[in-house]
Amino acid sequence: MEKIPYAILEKGSLLLASPDTDQGVFARSVILLCEHSLNGSFGLILNKTLGLELADDIFSFDKVTNNNIRFCMGGPLQANQMMLLHSCSEIPEQTLEICPSVYLGGDLSFLQEIAASDAGPMINLCFGYSGWQAGQLEREFLDGNWFLAPASYDYVFMDNPENLWSKILKDLGGKYASLSTVPENLFLN
């Protein structure tokens, strides 16, 4: 029996860019869909990390000892806006659960407290976001620009996010697994 592909476009879905997508930031992107409604959609790119360190002058931290904090480019829209994607369920009034054990939200005091601890929840500090107008994401999906997979804690906070796109395609199996080996630049093949 052939495995039926995941095809639910909703909060908690992962969007995987088709190998044909070569639109800059979206090339081989994995996006966690955080909101999807009749009014539009928004999500955060998980596998485009930024080589930043927490700057004391920006965040007013005395010290940063938590290695569970990762900087990500959430998307091309409002790149100066920061969103917290984390695994801490202890601040439910400020957060929205996106999928089991993955939350969106929080404030600077939460971030400061976590950054100063030796351990703690996983945090993706996402700068910017990816957004679609009403009906736009559905059209892109139907045009084959995106594949879908269910989100999970393990995918969202994977140790090597640069390998996330290939990992999920392999996990989906079948034709998707073979797509995971397509080189980024076909002209170099």
Swiss-Prot record:
Which NCBIfam families does this one have?
PRK00228.2-3
The cellular component terms of Gene Ontology attached to this UniProt record, alphabetical and capped at eight, are: cytosol
Specify the domain of life of the species encoding this protein.
Bacteria
Offer one Pfam family short name for this entry: DUF179
Q: List the disulfide bonds.
A: none
The Swiss-Prot or TrEMBL record describes its family as follows: Belongs to the UPF0301 (AlgH) family.
Where is the secretion signal located?
Answer: none
Q: What is this protein called?
A: UPF0301 protein CF0373
